[in-house]
Each structure stands twice: as C-alpha cells, then as structure tokens.
Amino acid sequence: YQVVSLYYDDPYDTALRQKLDGVDRREKFRLRYYGEKPAFFKLEKKYKVKGLCGKGACRLSREEGERLLRGDSAFLLEKEEPLAREFYAKLRRGLAPKTVVRYTREAFLYAPGNVRVTLDGDIRAGAPERFLIPQKLLPALGGLAVVEVKYDAFLPEIVKLAVQVPNRQGTACSKYALCRRYD
C-alpha cells in the first residue's frame, strides 16, 4: 500500500537537527494518508525518549485535513484529542510543512513478540505543495528500500534470522531526515 506523509518542522529545522545530532529526547509531527487519494488523514506525533520510541495519533476527516493544508487550523482547538491542541499551539509558534515523503509499504506481522516488519520501497520526496499530488515527487535514496523491525517485549529468533540480509546497513533511520536532503 502507498503511504504519503507531510512532515512539519520549525523555522530552525529543530526536528531534523535533533535527529541528525542523535538527541535523546525529540519529537516530530506529520500529516499522513494511505492510498492514492485521502479518505481521511492521520495527524501523528512521533517521539523518542531514552531510546524508546512512541507515537500519538489523531484522526482528521478529509475536510479537516484539507482545512489544515489551507492554513486553517482553528478547528483543532475543538477536537477532544490533546494531540490536536498541542499541534495547534506548535503551529502558532512556527511549526510549518517542510517536505513530503511517499513510499510503497509491504507489512508482515508475527504474533509472538507482536512483531511488525515493514519494507518501504519506491521512496520519493518533494515540496509540501505536492502532498495531494504525490505522483510528481522525485525518487530518493537511489532505489534503496528501508526495512523496519518493530516489536514489543522481545524479538523472536526466527525473525532475527529472517531479517539478516547481506549488504544491508543496520541503523536508526528517518525517512524524513533522508528525504530532506532533496529539498
């Protein structure tokens, strides 16, 4: 399936700089949809604290997402989710769209350990105004794919063996940071 994300950062690119510098406590915001055209949007906040990752999400209707894209964010104050109000406050303090990232994802689930392996390919990047027309984005990462392994308490041995791929680079990876090289 296709994933299209619009990443936000402040005028100083704090989220990008913190990622590149390996800052232990950091956050980033994105607006996301799945497929060719959005039926709805997800507003997400990803954060990392002491090496542990987390994510908060708030569903936005198609109309709300389009309002947000036009710069009308006042409706966020009326939503119940604290994330919506936090995002509104950050927008008022200068958070703004920075880049679009689009990719095709294949996801594989394994119940023991609540494991989710994702393979993200055909990664493309572009300017924020291309968010709703991702067909016009430029290829990024030279055709490389990103494999992510997410799990809860433990990673089963069979999964460890399955993801040992020759010529792969094991690292913390941010598609946002990688694709900002192309703006």
What role is predicted for each listed range?
Residues 1-183:
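Phosphate-end processing signature that detects enzymes handling 5′-triphosphorylated RNA
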